[in-house]
């Protein structure tokens, strides 16, 4: 998958540019970059992942591609309470399927959203393969 594929997957879940969003389980940042592209300047993104090395690499990529975006990188476990402001939206791309018990995680995540906030899930379709699923 390339950047345009990531943008395409998120586009339908993002109704307008700007706002305060989080990418939970952001890994290497492919979807964080897509989110930055779609939200544009003036937005704020919280990128959360347990892998500090991945977050550092993500920060380098973001600075090179979107130097005017405000991104906060948090090395944390998104299944535990986080210090986040009320969010306009949350992206969880290929991170929820790692959670054995999804309901408590989704309840926690829902609590971060402002009224009317959006949760955008990107997950593998295990029933039908596609070019990007290993």
Where are these regions (language model features)?
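A short acidic, Gly/Pro-enriched loop at the edge of an enzyme's catalytic core
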Residues: 79-90
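Short glycine-centered segments of the SAM/dcSAM-binding site in methyltransferase folds
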Residues: 20, 44, 116-118
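A short SAM/SAH-binding and catalytic strip from SAM-dependent methyltransferases
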Residues: 88-102
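Conserved class I S-adenosyl-L-methionine
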Residues: 118-134
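Class I SAM-dependent methyltransferase SAM/SAH-binding core
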Residues: 22, 27-80
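Conserved alpha-helix/loop element of class I SAM-dependent methyltransferases that forms part
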Residues: 1-20, 34
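A short glycine-rich, Lys/Arg-flanked "PGG" loop and its adjoining helix->strand segment in the class I
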Residues: 103-118
């Amino acid at each position: 998958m390339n950047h345009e594929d990531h943008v395409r997957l998120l586009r339908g879940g993002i109704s307008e540019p700007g706002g305060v969003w989080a990418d939970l389980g952001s890994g290497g940042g492919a979807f964080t970059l897509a989110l930055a592209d779609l939200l544009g300047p003036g937005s704020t993104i919280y990128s959360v992942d347990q892998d500090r090395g991945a977050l550092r690499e993500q920060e380098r990529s973001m600075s090179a591609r979107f130097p005017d975006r405000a991104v906060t990188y948090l090395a944390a476990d998104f299944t535990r309470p986080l210090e986040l402001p009320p969010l306009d939206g949350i992206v969880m791309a290929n991170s929820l399927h790692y959670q054995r018990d999804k309901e408590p995680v989704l309840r926690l995540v829902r609590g971060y959203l402002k009224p009317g906030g959006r949760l955008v899930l990107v997950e593998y379709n295990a029933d039908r393969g596609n070019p990007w699923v290993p």
